[in-house]
Structure formats: C-alpha cells, structure tokens
Amino acid sequence: MPQKVLITSALPYANGPLHFGHIAGVYLPADVYARFRRLLGDDVLYICGSDEFGIAITLNADREGLGYQEYVDMYHKLHKDTFEKLGFALDFFSRTTNPFHAELVQDFYSQLKASGLIENRISEQLYSEQEQRFLADRYVEGTCPRCGFDHARGDECQSCGADYEAIDLIDPKSKISGVELVKKETEHSYFLLDRMKDALLSFIQGCYLPDHVRKFVVDYIEHVRSRAITRDLSWGIPVPDFPGKVFYVWFDAPIGYISGTMEWAASQGNPDEWKRFWLEDGVEYVQFIGKDNLPFHSVVFPAMELGQKLDYKKVDALVVSEFYLLEGRQFSKSEGNYVDMDKFLSSYSLDKLRYVLAATAPETSDSEFTFLDFKTRCNSELVGKFGNFINRVLAFAEKNHYDKLSYHSVVLEDSDRAFLEEVRQLVRDAEKCYREYSLRKATSVIMSLAALGNVYFNQQAPWKLLKEGTRERVEAILFCACYCQKLLALISYPIIPESAVAIWEMISPKSLENCNLDTMYARDLWKEEILDVINEEFHLKSPRLLFTTVE
C-alpha cells in the first residue's frame, strides 16, 4: 500500500501579495516535497489556503474603504493565481471562510471548554478613550518588553520574535489614531496551555524539528502560560455564548488545515474522504512554516488537537524556515524593496526562479535574493553546467545520426560502469536531500550530476573516437550519457519540473502525451533494483534549448 502523506503549508494571510520571501521559505519547499513524494508513488495530499480573519485585515480594509469579505476575496484570488503561476502541485487551495470552518472552530472550542481547558477571566486590556473601544493586538503598537524595539506589534515583536499579550507593551498607542491607550477591565476566554505542559513535551519529543529551533520550542513549552483566544472585533468567527467576541486568528487559522481538507473532500464528491488523512492511522504529516509562526504550530495547535475527543492527526515533521531577504533587507512594497512577481516571470522562466530560490532557501539561517546571484547561478549553473550537458550530448547524437540507443546493443567498459555507479550514488544522495527537506543540498547534487556527465563526456571524447571509426564505442558512451540525463531529469523534477519534463521528452521512447515524471515508469527509477540493473532504451529527438543566458 502507498504511504499516505499529508502536507500542509502555513496559510498565507489575505492581507497583501506574496513575495519571494514567502515562496522561498515555505511554499516552494512544500511544493518540492509534494512532488518528490509523488515520485515515490506515495498517496499525497497537499492542502493550503488563505487565512482570512484577524485584525490586520480589518485595519487595512478600513483604510482602503473596502468591506472585509470583499477585501479577503481580492487577496484570496491573488494568492490562488500566484500559486498557479508558480506551478505549485497543490491538491486544494482553501480559505478560512470556507463553509466547514466556523462550525469546526466552534466545536474545537466547545470540546476544550468541556475538558476544563478554557476559562473566562476578567483582565486588564488596552482601551482607547478616543475611539471608545478595546483595541486588540494588531490595532496597537509600542515598545517591545524584551528587546526595546519601539514599533513592536501588539502580539509579537517583528524585531526579536518575542510573542506576548498587548498589555505587556511599554507605552502602547493606537495604530488608528496614535493616541496613548489606557488599561481597563474586560472579559475574555483563555486557553489553559500551562495545564498541557507534560503532554506537549511528550508530543514534541516525537516530532521532527530542525536543530536550530528545537531548543526554542522546548523552552517555550517549559514556560508556557495561558493565552487569551478571544478578541473584541466584528470580523471573525463568533465565540459560542459570548456576545461581542470573536476568536483570535491564531486559534482559528490552524484549524483551516482540517476544514480545508473537508472542503477538498466535498469537492471530490466524497465528504468523508478527509478522515483518511486526519483520523485514520498510517498517515505521515509534514507541515511547512516560517519561524515567525513557530509557537502556534509547535505548541498552540498541537495542544488544541490534544484536547479533542477525536484523535486528529498530529504533525510528524515541522519544517521551519528562517527569513529570506531582498538584497540584505526585508521585502517591503511600501519601501520599494520588492519584486513584482508578474513582471519577473515575464522576463525569466519559472524554472530559473524556482532553481535560484531553492539554491538560496533560508533553511537554517537567514538568506537573501540578489539579482547578481540570480544572474550568476542561471548562467554558470543552469546554462553552463545543466543545459550544456543536455544540449551537447543530444546535438552530437543528432549530428552523427544516433537516434536509438539500447542497453542490449552496447558493450560497457569498466570506465562506463564506474561512471554509472557514480550517477546512481548521486541519485541516492538526492533522495536523501529531499527526505531531509533540504532544497539547497538537492540543487547542489543536481549540479554535481550535471557536472559529472560533462566530465564523463569530455573524458570519453566520442568525437575523436568517431574519427577513428569506432562507432559502436560511441554508441555505448551516448547510452551512458543519456542514462545520466534521464536520472538528472528525475532528481531535478521536484525543483525545475518544466525542464525535467523537456529532457524526458527528448530521450524517452514514450509518446509525448504520456511523458510525465509522475508516472510509475519514473517512480520505479527510485527503486534500488532499477538503479543497479540497467535495462534502458532511448529514442533521441532534436535538442531544445532549456535555458537562455541572463543578461
């Protein structure tokens, strides 16, 4: 039976366009991993969607004079279109205004309350006397109580990453009017996370976390405290039996992974299909997030699941990225440090962008996109190594009338066998990189394989042998080079799928209509017995230029 694999990535907030930082950190890694697991023949479900509630949305919608639903509709469509332009292999792109979400969120809350994990408390919150209302976190800014950053948001500091309650800010002010805020008593529901410390520590021991964040998560759980999960807002999911209150966005948003799967199942005509991934055994669940979302995905959401009667699937691996910068600075459209996605893709191929973002992904530390690095990698790696290897072999074969190559008609020498073993080892290395969620290492292996193919072709020098009349030896060299190209297409497909399919089409004996690396024909290549026993046939076609030089 194929392994069931559930993949989710942090829901993009319906409050602005996606930029390269979002793509490189979270969404490209999730897409690459989904493609890789499908190549293995696994039963993969990849769910994402828009996060459509929260204070930041109401703030910006008010500024733009738009209704809240109109505002999130606009950005939901933009996000969905962006994912499609980037070729992401999603099974379903949902949203937290989907028809299943509100009821499920309220049910989560009711079960936590019935389990004694929710209690209402009267506490001091920030109040604007000018606006005559309590202001929830994103309506507030002030000085961070940890690092002293003087424009910290009301729920987390964008400078040091600390998260806290808005009441903890020093010198808090309204983001609407700029007036100083006062403290005033009000009532909210609190999630008693401190009562779940032992259960959370036990859970996190069995969950994959990158080394660079594990200590943070364990420390967070050790010092976890109750959190207010309600807000005084009109836009949000109403809290049962608590008039005037809606759920805090970080209580409702993670439940969107489940409600989004419900919506997917309904769209397939099988409303219970979601249970196969969330309630049945034998599922591997991998979640891709940015480090700024870490407390909510590693602590709050697992705690919410642990407090339910239904045994919802808990995450097995949290893949956490650092920040991705543009020329050393944070992406900011308002400050002009921004790349327009549509304009960029009108000038450069999608595979060029995917490759460079993968090669520079912020996996264990902050990294950056620079146009000089983009140009250098495209020209030296994609054109100079990868594309050059494909083109020179196929151009030589076409010029000298080699259009069919078969294992059964060639005689391999020791140098060929040694080369093929190196090729197979690099394929194993690539699989290891993908299993360990490292796009950077995978791109390095891809280029190593292309470089190996170039070195082999140079050393064998078939153009010299052809002059000596040893046509049969040239056929063996071309066979080995094409075998290398086929495996190069396989291991590069998760990252540069268009180019990989183009290679496949140029050497595969299958028809173009059926040429897809997601077929079992490709999946079998991962199996050790296929890697170790060559039984191939290649039908060569005219070479097509995969990559052009970036000026």
From Swiss-Prot:
Cofactor (UniProt): Zn(2+)
- Span(s) of short sequence motif 'HIGH' region: 12-22
The record's section on CDD domains has: Anticodon_Ia_Met (cd07957), MetRS_core (cd00814)
Q: Which GO terms describe its biological process?
A: methionyl-tRNA aminoacylation
What does the entry list as the binding residues for ATP? 333
* Annotated catalysed reactions: tRNA(Met) + L-methionine + ATP = L-methionyl-tRNA(Met) + AMP + diphosphate
Q: Which Gene3D superfamilies match?
A: HUPs, Isoleucyl-tRNA Synthetase, Domain 1, Methionyl-tRNA synthetase, Zn-domain
Q: How does it assemble?
A: Monomer.
Record function comment: Is required not only for elongation of protein synthesis but also for the initiation of all mRNA translation through initiator tRNA(fMet) aminoacylation.
Protein name in the entry = Methionine--tRNA ligase
